Amino acid sequence: MKKIFIFAAAGLLLVAGCKGGKKAAGDSVTEPEAAASVAAGPKVMAREVPERMDDFVFENDLIAGRFYGKALEGDPTSPGLDVWVKLPGKLVADDWYAHAVSDPEYYHHDHGGKDCYKVSVSLGGGASAPLVGGKLSYPATNWREAAVLSQSDDAVTFVLKYPAWDAGGVSVRLEKTVTVTAGSYFCKVEDRYYGDFQELEIAAGFWIHEWKEGCAMGTDDDFIALWEPASDQSVEPEDGMIGIALVMPAEHMTEILDDGEKRHHICIAKVRSGEPLTYWFGSCWSKGDIKDFQQWTNTVKSQAGAAGIAAASSN
């Protein structure tokens, strides 16, 4: 098994790798110590937020994030994941949105966490898009349909639907199914692309923001990982560091994609129409339980291992 890890304080190293298709989907690995501190009651949530520009927000006791809806199109139109940082232990999204009704900047300030991650037009903290001629072909709109498919105190699954758009002369549409599990830094994703194609090349990954002192990046057979400043905002003097990762057990290639404006670390795989592309996106905050890139890498490796075990049992 080939393993490559990159730790860098300055400069950006291009990493390329290839792995075999011996694994597929599985369950998320949990963090028992963090989960044990959570009070009784729901430990997950996911819902549409019509009161805030049609966001679709989700969270568990460790992580939170959102995908942009119709009302925000153009500012930006992006399939990317907007990562929220937060301290472990409780759900915060509903409280933050409630305060934002009277103070729109409320969740941009630290209240045990905050929204300080910049998405722009990108894959953000973990999403996918067709790869056409070496460039990402983003959906022409934000999500237009959403539904919660199942929900309990410990897990919630939802689907977001993106209408058809032109991807290099091929009309494709996307159905994104996400499962959020209590006690995990990762969410499982099944992206299904539909269209009149035999195979479609898909890139799943995350945006690499400005490379600064303290940044680090690594890759292995089953994952790509990043450690970078949590924010490029100036609202707070110090927002700490954020860990981002994407786990993909299926056969894929990895590379750094630079279009002159943004750099993404991506996993590239081919899918047939309606075939699920399964991966996990994950995040952490240095002000929480995971303090450095080594801890984050260990957590990511555990998730990759869990995905592989589940894949082996399903094949």
Task: Name each model-derived stretch.
Residues 26-137:
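Solvent-exposed N-terminal domain segments of exported/luminal and surface proteins
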Residues 15-17:
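C-terminal motif of bacterial Sec signal peptides marking the signal peptidase cleavage site
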Residues 194, 210-263:
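Accessory, usually C-terminal, subdomains that scaffold auxiliary metal cofactors
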Residues 4-13:
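Sec-dependent N-terminal signal peptides
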Residues 244-315:
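Beta-strand-rich recognition/accessory modules
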Residues 105-181:
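Extended, loop-rich substrate-binding clefts of extracytoplasmic carbohydrate-active enzymes
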Residues 174, 185-218:
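Acidic (Asp/Glu-rich), glycine- and aromatic
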Residues 19-21:
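Bacterial signal peptide processing site
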